[in-house]
Amino acid sequence: ATVASLPILEKAIASPLPEMRFWGVVGYAKLARENQINICPQTLLALLQDENPYIASEAAYTVVYLGKAQEGIARLITPVQEKDRKIGYSSLECLSLDPEMRDYIRPFLSELKEAAENLPRLENEDAGLMARGILVNLGEMDIKDLHCPEAYKKGLKLNYGRRAMVPLPNSFE
């Protein structure tokens, strides 16, 4: 996407087709992230309430870069449906890796800490793990606390239970 493609992106984000809206938002995200645009159109802001959680999440990510950090991050932290929490957290994790965006996330630390503590810890790729990952990225949690002791023990049990490699790597016997 380029600035010259903005009229096409505007049509795309207003489309009744979810695929068009999604890719239109992705185009806006690229331009916003690269500081090629700095105005947030109302149509894009309205997509924070899109029924498709992927579109809403990408729109939220985008509006943060367009000066609407409060609205965007609030949408990523608070899903419409609990089952979609990981979608928003995925975008929030990307934002937390950008040093320029970290201060915008900090007002939401209490929500993230609560999610990190209360959401399931042992499920693979669970939202609690994602919340803890965001806190690690922000420097609010030690990387050693990313996984709980039960998960660590479970991992050790799995590794100790594996069949030994024969022959060993780099051995000549």
Feature locations, PLM:
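Structural detector for internal amphipathic alpha-helices that build alpha-solenoid repeat scaffolds
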Residues: 1, 11, 19-35, 54-68, ...
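Amphipathic alpha-helical scaffolding segments comprising HEAT/armadillo-like alpha-solenoid repeats
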Residues: 2-13, 34-48, 69-81, 101-117, ...
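Short coil turns that connect the paired helices of HEAT/ARM alpha-solenoid repeats
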Residues: 14-19, 48-54, 79-86, 114, ...
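Short, surface-exposed, charged/polar-biased interaction segments
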Residues: 26, 30, 61, 65, ...
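Eukaryotic protein-protein interaction scaffolds centered on beta-propeller repeats
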Residues: 143-157, 161-173
